[in-house]
């Protein structure tokens, strides 16, 4: 099992503070994620982490799309429902400059656990 950080939202189309969905993640290239992997979700414009999800399908290609043609299903394990309360990414050792032009990056088990614990703690409040 691998651990990932999934970048959600775009600079010109950020996630809303509330009312976002966590059912699928898209990528421009074939992702290396696999069913059963775990991930932390990062809100790009907010520069914060807000959810822990399980990847529940293998990547699927939609040849009808010209951009973001690869996607996979995700299932939230714990999520903050308001991004105003999300954890700044620097607090969990994820720096926005390392995410430039990526839709996902691999996390070390230690990075994942630090982010997971912070999200679980914040969700319990």
Protein language model regions, located:
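Short coil-to-beta transition motif at edge beta-strands of beta-rich domains
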Residues: 29-43
């Amino acid at each position: 099992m691998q651990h990932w950080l999934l970048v959600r939202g775009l600079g010109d189309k950020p996630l809303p503070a509330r009312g976002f969905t966590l059912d699928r993640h898209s990528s421009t290239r074939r992702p290396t994620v696999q069913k059963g992997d775990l991930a932390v979700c990062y809100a790009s414009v907010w520069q914060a982490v807000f959810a822990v999800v399980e990847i529940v399908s293998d990547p699927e290609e939609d040849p009808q799309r010209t951009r973001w043609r690869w996607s996979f299903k995700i299932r939230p394990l714990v999520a903050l429902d308001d991004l105003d309360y999300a954890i700044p990414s620097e607090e969990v050792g994820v720096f926005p400059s390392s995410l430039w032009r990526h839709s996902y990056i691999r996390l070390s088990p230690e990075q994942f656990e630090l982010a997971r614990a912070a999200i679980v703690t914040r969700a319990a409040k």
